[in-house]
């Protein structure tokens, strides 16, 4: 047994699915599956995830897309209403919506979250985003000016404090630079502890996460390099040391699998050959608009031309056995709690994951059972 397998045996890994709330999921390619988002599609995906024992489903928010031949992310559902619908048709899986904090006041978000907590019987949590793509907000007159790029996490810190006050005590009197609460009330409060996700990778984002969040989401890096994200987790561990809070990292990967390594690689090369260069160029322009942040932000990685066909997220390409082994390596990085997965073809990809990949994973034996993993 490999050292990675030994480690994975001792460290159970949580797995979530990043559901495709926007058209075409996460592939900017004319050669990838082309589809519109719908409640029905996301319901099928989330129910499959629940069936296969996945731990959570997360939806993003995107208010304006990248255009191009594939009209990438020009078509998007809204996160809270989607997750409320999914909460009503699921029974076990945890659900996370994303709050566009420039659009929604924190007291309203706190109440929406409490409502979905009620629908789901305590299975709901929240992902907070500051907003990095100016046109998403300027189109509705809500962009606060480009100086906001340098103040995003000061704004988000006040926002999160209002949420925590309301969820934990039922009232907030915060008087800050961005928000002024006047005996603001919330009832009923959530029945379960409300968990917060943040995906900040800059120094300011890490400091925010270590102070206010429960989970940090970060990008995997490279193709078939499942531990290359380790320096990002190390930076969070340093930030956590200053706050003393328990925050774990979850890593985003795209899974492209097939019966053989060669077949999976051919699929990946085919997607890259059809890259939507117009949409990729738009992504690069939006990334360059933020001149206030450093080189360590998510958008800097997304816009890198190296593998922009899937916004440079970590990609695991191979046979079912290869992908299972690569995923088991992820959890060997100290501070890693799990992974967030996307697929080139979500319905088939989830079936393949649930029936052919997960049973081979040492880090998922708490889900599949020891005997099944050994037989496979």
Swiss-Prot record:
Please name the InterPro entries in this protein's record.
Luciferase-like_dom, Luciferase-like_sf, Pyrimidine_monooxygenase_RutA, SsuD_RutA_monooxygenase
Instruction: Please name the GO terms that the record assigns under molecular function.
Output: alkanesulfonate monooxygenase activity; uracil oxygenase activity
Pfam families reported in the protein's UniProt record: Bac_luciferase
What biological processes does GO assign it?
A: alkanesulfonate catabolic process; nitrogen utilization; uracil catabolic process
Where in the chain are disulfide-linked cysteines found? none
> What top-tier enzyme class does this entry carry?
oxidoreductase
Q: Which domain of life is it from?
A: Bacteria
List ligand-binding residues for FMN: 61-62, 127, 136, 152-153, 202
Q: What family is this protein classified in? A: Belongs to the NtaA/SnaA/DszA monooxygenase family. RutA subfamily.
Q: What does this protein do?
A: The FMN-N(5)-oxide reacts spontaneously with NADH to produce FMN. Requires the flavin reductase RutF to regenerate FMN in vivo.
Report the protein name in the record: Pyrimidine monooxygenase RutA
Q: Which species? A: Methylorubrum populi (strain ATCC BAA-705 / NCIMB 13946 / BJ001)
